Amino acid sequence: MTMTLHTKASGMALLHQIQGNELETLNRPQLKIPLERPLGEVYVDGSKPAVYNYPEGAAYDFNAAAAASAPVYGQSGLAYGSGSEAAAFGANGLGGFPPLNSVSPSPLVLLHPPPQLSPFLHPHGQQVPYYLENEPSGYAVREAGPPAFYRPTSDNRRQSGRERLASTGDKGSMAMESAKETRYCAVCNDYASGYHYGVWSCEGCKAFFKRSIQGHNDYMCPATNQCTIDKNRRKSCQACRLRKCYEVGMMKGGIRKDRRGGRMLKHKRQRDEGEGRNEVGSSGDVRASNLWPSPLLIKHTKKNSPALSLTADQMVSALLEAEPPIIYSDYDPSRPFSEASMMGLLTNLADRELVHMINWAKRVPGFVDLSLHDQVHLLECAWLEILMIGLVWRSMEHPGKLLFAPNLLLDRNQGKCVEGMVEIFDMLLATSSRFRMMNLQGEEFVCLKSIILLNSGVYTFLSSTLKSLEEKDHIHRVLDKITDTLIHLMAKAGLSLQQQHRRLAQLLLILSHIRHMSNKGMEHLYNMKCKNVVPLYDLLLEMLDAHRLHAPANRGGAPMEEMNQSQLATTGSTSAHSLQAYYITEEAGAFPTTV
């Protein structure tokens, strides 16, 4: 059945009839929403079919009647029906709404909240939204396309997703560009201008290092060879500035492999970045190492080192076989201790132990694979730590006493005869007690001693060639091998994984305490030397001076130390050659084997 709208009032009545039936069907509260502007401005597209099939099967063709009827609302104003018509409409009880002339001049249209759709029920139970449109040609009810109002289409979703990805990529690229622009100089912490001589550095440090390696660099530090080098104080000491350049890894041959000139490198980098962006989606795993070029590609020239092919049990056997022999002291029980006599006994014992320490170090797996310069450097940095951990190990079975030799067992009270010795005695006794509490095994002890040797100077190499980096890499791999051996020993002892991790951490923490004791002992020994309490033997003296050149900043050193800096530097400059002479002598079999 088709109904035609002849008047404005009858059209409004039909609208309210439709809305009333809908609300009764859905059992929903009636809503009154004031129409703030013409419906033609609220609703859009009117190109949908205008025939609606009610559940009863009756059909109402509004398009046919729209041409013959006037619009419900005009653009210039609104007109309402007569009072009688409005009263008749109210009496009919279409939805129970009050007469139109009893409300404010603003018309009330029975629509749902935005998007103002009327969800009529289809016979199959689905809600199909319809909207009203005020056209100049007439009044029509049109079906609203759900995609236009409820959710974006798939194309819109893809487009918005691409926009979000593009904005995210732009932000990420901006962050990466800003990160690239904030490189700092490894020497003075100023802004880096580029990658020079193997490290990121500023123009000032680059030029300084270039002058130093091309000309004479016999710089002399006026203080303790430990001056602070930063942006403001980098020009205060040339010697310490050059030392720090070497420490951070500057080297004469440290030039990037992709160095081909500015313009070619720029084009290559842009091309690589473009290819990288295209491959991000397929790779799925962008590693941080790909963001920046590797400074240097270190070749593992010592891959075939026998030390790296040893099993854990073979490593332990090699370390146990390398242990030095037992050494006896010249102690005479009939003579009472004095400061000079005790220091004489201890320094004589240390000097003889140093001779055997060189032979022991050569038998540590992987040590002889290093250059002679680096072997000497490691020994100069670690000799007192090695002596102290051996002393602590021997004293485990003697609580409260230190076993310097089988015939020299000293307690804390006997150490008081030497000024400043009690503090060192207390630290040694505490470490021995800690070993005893942990029930340290001999296999673990030899591993710890080897770690001390290899780790002592690995970060203070003064070599300026690519070979020094290869040496460091080799040392790190041997250290990893020894650490794995320690873990193997703990697993072999039946410890759980958590207990293995805890014990390994406890053992390695003790090494830092031994380093602290070594620094204290070095200061004490140097003070004894300056006071001429006891003459030092040649090898011990050379090792002492060399260690002080490589050691970190001394804290609270005596004023006399600063007075002897030039003498120390002069003596220390020949220490490596003296120790190398011991190496050569030992190779020839001329080392004394006093035990």
UniProtKB/Swiss-Prot annotation:
Residues with the Asymmetric dimethylarginine modification? 260
> Matching SMART domains, A to Z?
HOLI, ZnF_C4
Q: Where is this region: Modulating (transactivation AF-1)?
A: 1-184
Organism the protein comes from: Felis catus
Residues that, per the record, bind 17beta-estradiol: 353, 394, 524
**Ranges annotated as DNA-binding:** 185-250
- Stretches for region Interaction with DDX5: 35-174
Family the UniProt entry places it in: Belongs to the nuclear hormone receptor family. NR3 subfamily.
What the entry says about post-translational processing? Ubiquitinated; regulated by LATS1 via DCAF1 it leads to ESR1 proteasomal degradation. Deubiquitinated by OTUB1. Ubiquitinated by STUB1/CHIP; in the CA1 hippocampal region following loss of endogenous circulating estradiol (17-beta-estradiol/E2). Ubiquitinated by UBR5, leading to its degradation: UBR5 specifically recognizes and binds ligand-bound ESR1 when it is not associated with coactivators (NCOAs). In presence of NCOAs, the UBR5-degron is not accessible, preventing its ubiquitination and degradation. Phosphorylated by cyclin A/CDK2 and CK1. Phosphorylation probably enhances transcriptional activity. Dephosphorylation at Ser-118 by PPP5C inhibits its transactivation activity. Phosphorylated by LMTK3 (in vitro).
What's the encoding gene here? ESR1
Q: Which residues carry this modification: Phosphoserine?
A: 104, 106, 118, 167
Q: What is known of its domains?
A: Composed of three domains: a modulating N-terminal domain, a DNA-binding domain and a C-terminal ligand-binding domain. The modulating domain, also known as A/B or AF-1 domain has a ligand-independent transactivation function. The C-terminus contains a ligand-dependent transactivation domain, also known as E/F or AF-2 domain which overlaps with the ligand binding domain. AF-1 and AF-2 activate transcription independently and synergistically and act in a promoter- and cell-specific manner.
Function, as annotated, reads: Nuclear hormone receptor. The steroid hormones and their receptors are involved in the regulation of eukaryotic gene expression and affect cellular proliferation and differentiation in target tissues. Ligand-dependent nuclear transactivation involves either direct homodimer binding to a palindromic estrogen response element (ERE) sequence or association with other DNA-binding transcription factors, such as AP-1/c-Jun, c-Fos, ATF-2, Sp1 and Sp3, to mediate ERE-independent signaling.
Assembly mode: Binds DNA as a homodimer. Can form a heterodimer with ESR2. Interacts with coactivator NCOA5. Interacts with PELP1, the interaction is enhanced by 17-beta-estradiol; the interaction increases ESR1 transcriptional activity. Interacts with NCOA7; the interaction is ligand-inducible. Interacts with AKAP13, CUEDC2, HEXIM1, KDM5A, MAP1S, SMARD1, and UBE1C. Interacts with MUC1; the interaction is stimulated by 7 beta-estradiol (E2) and enhances ESR1-mediated transcription. Interacts with DNTTIP2, and UIMC1. Interacts with KMT2D/MLL2. Interacts with ATAD2; the interaction is enhanced by estradiol.
According to the Swiss-Prot or TrEMBL entry, at which residues is a lipid covalently attached (S-palmitoyl cysteine)?
Answer: 447
Per the UniProt entry, the glycosylated residues are: 10, 571
Gene Ontology cellular component list: chromatin; cytoplasm; Golgi apparatus; nucleus; plasma membrane
Regions of compositional bias (Basic residues) in chain numbering: 257-269
Q: What's the protein called, per UniProt?
A: Estrogen receptor
Region Disordered, annotated ranges? 149-173, 257-287
